Amino acid sequence: IGLDYYYDEPGRDLQKKWFARQLQVAAETQMPVIIHSRDAAKDTLDIMNEHCAWQNGGVIHCFSYSPEIAKIYLDKGFYLGIGGVVTFKNSKKLKEVVEMMPLSQMVLETDSPYLTPVPHRGKRNDSGYLTHVVDEIAALKSCDREEIIRITRENAHKLYRIGQ
């Protein structure tokens, strides 16, 4: 659920209306939310604040905003989804976010078939390519790749309430 202002259709007002309604449904059912927010940082945050969307947690899918915006979501207890974009040469902002954020609030994503990590960029994305994302995160955070795999797996289990 969320807002995507990259394209003009559907219009922003309609997107905001249905995003708000979907947040209400998530609150009523006490489910975490998976938020898609593209070129819509302010409106996404405003609507989430307006609808108290923080209580059941969730993830900001394919996080692509600044470290300052990341801090807002992290302070609210949300996870940030990190995928192939972190391997791109021009993803300076996202690399800064990964460096500053705790592993305890990170989940790994593919966004398949899109956003394929380097060195496979331009091909159809596949979950098998997550190893490149893990390697990049390990380099940015100066930690062991096995630790990243273990912690992000635990995070996904918590987020999706697997085994609870």
Positions of predicted regions on the chain:
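Catalytic pocket-lining loop regions of alpha/beta-barrel enzymes
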Residues: 11-107
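Non-membrane alpha-helical structural segments and their capping/turn regions in soluble enzymes
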Residues: 9-20, 38, 124-131, 146, ...
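Mid-to-C-terminal alpha-helical segments outside catalytic/metal-binding sites
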Residues: 25, 127-164
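Residue-level recognition of specific faces of alpha-helices
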Residues: 59-62, 97, 114, 129, ...
